Amino acid sequence: MRHLRIMSGILMFALLLAFTGIAQNKYVGAKFCGACHKAKEKGEAYAIWEKSKHAKAFETLKSKEADDIAKKKGLTKPASESPECLKCHVTGGGAATNVEAGFKKEEGVTCEACHGAASGYKMIHNKADGKEKAKAAGLKLNDKTDAKPCQKCHNDESPTKKEFKMAEMWAKIEHKLPPKK
């Protein structure tokens, strides 16, 4: 009887792990998004991102200044390898276990930092009836009134913190879809 309870507990735990693993979307990377979202009719989102500081976020970690900041914070690895830095300079924090093959940390802070890991919605979000299905599958549609996603990194913990002004920041990354004709 004791063994049955132990085995039941192990089985329940294994099932819980299996189902939470299935439900977790993976990051696909900006290049995947860019395949469609470069186009004018898609709001040129990829081009806007490519010119942004977000696209260069990982690159900044390769600088002497970033390594000096990391040392000052007591980190033993270079900034470009430190989880404490990667959590804000790479979408998904550089966690290699939650990514698809095309994902590259060198892309920095990508579409998925705001819109959620895309593996669950990448093939349905642009279909005629896909928006609601995509949202149910993990797509996040943010707007200029919601600073929470931004403030996960733009906050007092950042060693290079600057005053966070949502309206100004939003204007730099906003990518509206053109009205449908």
Q: What are the language-model segments listed below?
A:
Residues A118-S119, S158:
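Short Gly/Pro-enriched loop/turn and capping motifs at secondary-structure junctions
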Residues C33, C85-C88, C111-C114, C150-C153:
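Short cysteine-rich clusters marking metal-coordination/redox-active sites
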